[in-house]
């Protein structure tokens, strides 16, 4: 039996790769989780847009003096920091496009609210709420994919470490 290199060198090399794999998998997992910090807030804000849309219709129908205040609250929710973060480069295009459609349709809805066009609003509110629902669903799927990514990275790191420990 011939030893080609010292055991300490093999152990040092294996230890180095184990530490490197641990740092890489942990770092990527932490970056992914950091990008998830506002996911729940974004889903809650997006979901609240549904209720606010119906409230605006009620305000319009009842000629409520609260209509302008509620329009401003809707605008603030639509432009909240949690939703504005969805314009980042790493957010899937499906989420960005649904958010963009909500914005574009809000401009029309807001103009109709200002004009007091109740018939138009009643005819279009269900479609707008359906768009909100699809947006919330896209956000939920995006958040779930990030969790699965963290799981996959952690699993790959664990398998890599296991391989190094038992085959080095």
Located regions from the model:
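Alpha-helical transmembrane segments
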Residues: 14-17, 43-46, 153-159
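Extracytoplasmic ligand-binding sensor domains of the Cache superfamily
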Residues: 58-112
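Extracytoplasmic
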Residues: 43, 48, 52-59, 98-152
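Juxtamembrane membrane-water interface segments immediately C-terminal to a transmembrane helix
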Residues: 32-60, 64, 68-72
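Extreme N-terminal signal-anchor transmembrane helix of membrane signaling/transducer proteins, especially
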Residues: 5-33, 159-167
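Juxtamembrane loop-transmembrane helix junctions in multi-pass integral membrane proteins
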Residues: 2-9, 31, 35-38, 135-138, ...
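Interfacial "cap-and-anchor" motif at the non-cytosolic start of specific transmembrane alpha-helices
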Residues: 40, 146-164
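A ubiquitous short alpha-helical element
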Residues: 12-15, 38-44, 89-98
């Amino acid at each position: 039996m011939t030893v080609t290199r010292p055991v300490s060198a093999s152990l040092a090399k294996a230890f180095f790769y184990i530490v490197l794999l641990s740092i890489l998998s942990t770092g990527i997992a932490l970056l992914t989780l950091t990008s998830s910090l506002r996911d729940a807030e974004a889903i809650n804000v997006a979901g609240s847009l549904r209720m606010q849309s119906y409230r605006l219709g009620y305000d319009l129908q009842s000629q409520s003096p609260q209509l302008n205040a509620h329009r401003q609250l809707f605008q603030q929710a639509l432009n909240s920091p949690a939703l504005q973060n969805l314009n980042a480069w790493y957010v899937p295009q499906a989420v960005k496009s649904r958010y963009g459609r909500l914005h574009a349709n809000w401009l029309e809805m807001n103009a109709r609210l200002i004009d007091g066009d109740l018939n138009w609003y009643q005819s279009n509110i269900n479609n707008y709420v359906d768009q909100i629902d699809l947006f919330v669903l896209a956000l939920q799927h995006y958040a779930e994919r990030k969790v699965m990514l963290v799981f996959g990275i952690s699993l790959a790191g664990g398998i890599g470490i296991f391989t190094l420990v038992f085959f080095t």
